[in-house]
């Protein structure tokens, strides 16, 4: 599988099957991956192979770059369907994630009020109150949950710190339905399912 490391802080727009014309917002360094999972299927590669040397983009850098891109798109197109927080790892790790969400909402309302704001996250930071509240304010709060099987999570998602699926599931309930949970599909054989 080819490895993709995204520019920072803004990339695209790209055409997404699920989301439409998507302008990417990468809150992580542009030269590597920073994530609380080390998934075997990650398009950004393994954490150990792509450790960033550059710093995180600042809140101001993100806001300025996003505004410049949105101004350009308002003059020249294309019209974005969605502004998507994704990129080189887990976006909610950024220490100013909540403030950046507020900035993004204000800029979206100014330039493309019909565009949605999406966050693609692995849900490991939803216990931080400021992250939880920020995720409640986006249009598409997309929190990955590959399975509720702890063994599978350890083998495939490979959390880099404390991770208890039962705690995550309980916290997901606190979103009261304002969450999208994509589930991955894995080919299993009958002996695997029965074991």
What residues fall within each predicted segment?
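Single conserved hydrophobic/aromatic residue that forms the stacking wall/gate
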Residues: 187-195
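Hydrophobic faces of well-ordered beta-strands that scaffold small-molecule active sites
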Residues: 23, 117-119, 141-143, 179-181
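Canonical radical SAM enzyme core domain
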Residues: 52-67, 92-137, 145-150, 159-163, ...
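Short, charged low-complexity linear segments at domain edges
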Residues: 2-27
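Short Fe-S-cluster ligation motifs
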Residues: 65-84
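Glycine-rich S-adenosyl-L-methionine
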Residues: 159-174
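Canonical Radical SAM [4Fe-4S] cluster-binding loop centered on the CxxxCxxC motif
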Residues: 18-61
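A structural motif corresponding to the C-terminal end of an alpha-helix
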Residues: 111, 171-179
